[in-house]
Amino acid sequence: MSQDFWFLLLPGFSVMGFVSAVEPLRVANRFHADLYRWHVLSADGGPVLASNGMSVNSDGALEPLKKGDLLFVVAGFEPLRAVTPALVQWLRKLDRNGVTLGGIDTGSVVLAEAGLLDGRRATLHWEAIDAFQESYPQLSVTQELFEIDGPRITSAGGTASIDLMLDLIAQAHGPQLAVQVSEQFVLGRIRPRQDHQRLQVATRYGVSNRKLVQVIGEMERHTEPPLTTLELAERIQVTRRQLERLFRVHLDDTPSNFYLGLRLDKARQLLRQTDLSVLQVSLACGFESPSYFSRSYRARFAASPSQDRAVLPLKAPAATPPGAPAGHRTPRAERG
């Protein structure tokens, strides 16, 4: 008996994340006919415009699904632009009816907004994780490629959707079929869920010095509150002068200026992806002085935090999450 996979495409969705989820199902059917069926939905039943400008036709709107089906919300930039009370109510009804719910790329944001990730592990695209954590601090978010936690299945999007589907194929029909499918995509290996979403520090920054890689990792993990240069040096067991020399020789920078850049980059993401105030963003990135934050931000991005902030459209509030008091409004988080 075929298993039905449904993909709800939201405007601005990632084509890579979507296609990487569908293609493994298609290839699995080449080896064993009719294992899977897949369908595309949109909020209004019409075509959906992806982030790259492509238009994808849908098979229907928010229709009833049956127990045992899988529904993935596929999103990308600004997923909450598409969230409406009708969508939230539909997702909750699917959950009550035994449909497994998932998110691809930033689809997890929509599930969180609907109150459907409470008590479950979830992941999403690395670029949106900081904003997600700030907007939904009560939820358990990881940096894994994908998460399967009971009736919730989430993927970071991109090629991680392939790894997720290979895992689901292996669970349902055995690892050998998953290997056969992976070989059709010329994959060197099937990545486990705990693989890193991002390239290693050494690759991202073009450095090979072990101590330098370690200290950049410490900086990325401690943006609030930030560590002092002396504390950073102590953590990698070098002197302050040795640490400063490492940055000068390999990055033509100082530790403090490099660290400041990391924190400002995080601040920019939060400004563009959340409803946090400028003050809240500055505090979340380790800036105790709002004026220093604004000056530093303008120096790096040639715009003030308020000028650089993405404009979030007003929309009707989503339905109240289960068990929440009247008037509750879940914080927003958007990738982009």
Curated annotation (Swiss-Prot):
<dbReference type="InterPro" id="IPR029062">
    <property type="entry name" value="Class_I_gatase-like"/>
</dbReference>
<dbReference type="InterPro" id="IPR009057">
    <property type="entry name" value="Homeodomain-like_sf"/>
</dbReference>
<dbReference type="Pfam" id="PF12833">
    <property type="entry name" value="HTH_18"/>
</dbReference>
<keyword id="KW-0805">Transcription regulation</keyword>
<dbReference type="GO" id="GO:0009896">
    <property type="term" value="P:positive regulation of catabolic process"/>
</dbReference>
<feature type="DNA-binding region" description="H-T-H motif">
    <location>
        <begin position="278"/>
        <end position="301"/>
    </location>
</feature>
<dbReference type="InterPro" id="IPR052158">
    <property type="entry name" value="INH-QAR"/>
</dbReference>
<keyword id="KW-0238">DNA-binding</keyword>
<keyword id="KW-0010">Activator</keyword>
<dbReference type="GO" id="GO:0006355">
    <property type="term" value="P:regulation of DNA-templated transcription"/>
</dbReference>
<feature type="DNA-binding region" description="H-T-H motif">
    <location>
        <begin position="230"/>
        <end position="251"/>
    </location>
</feature>
<keyword id="KW-0804">Transcription</keyword>
<feature type="region of interest" description="Disordered">
    <location>
        <begin position="305"/>
        <end position="336"/>
    </location>
</feature>
<dbReference type="GO" id="GO:0043565">
    <property type="term" value="F:sequence-specific DNA binding"/>
</dbReference>
<dbReference type="InterPro" id="IPR018060">
    <property type="entry name" value="HTH_AraC"/>
</dbReference>
<dbReference type="InterPro" id="IPR002818">
    <property type="entry name" value="DJ-1/PfpI"/>
</dbReference>
<dbReference type="Pfam" id="PF01965">
    <property type="entry name" value="DJ-1_PfpI"/>
</dbReference>
<dbReference type="GO" id="GO:0003700">
    <property type="term" value="F:DNA-binding transcription factor activity"/>
</dbReference>
<comment type="function">
    <text>Induces the transcription of the PA5384-PA5388 operon in response to carnitine. This operon is involved in the degradation of L-carnitine, and allows P.aeruginosa to grow on L-carnitine as the sole source of carbon and nitrogen.</text>
</comment>
<dbReference type="InterPro" id="IPR018062">
    <property type="entry name" value="HTH_AraC-typ_CS"/>
</dbReference>
<protein>
    <recommendedName>
        <fullName>HTH-type transcriptional regulator CdhR</fullName>
    </recommendedName>
</protein>
<feature type="domain" description="HTH araC/xylS-type">
    <location>
        <begin position="213"/>
        <end position="311"/>
    </location>
</feature>
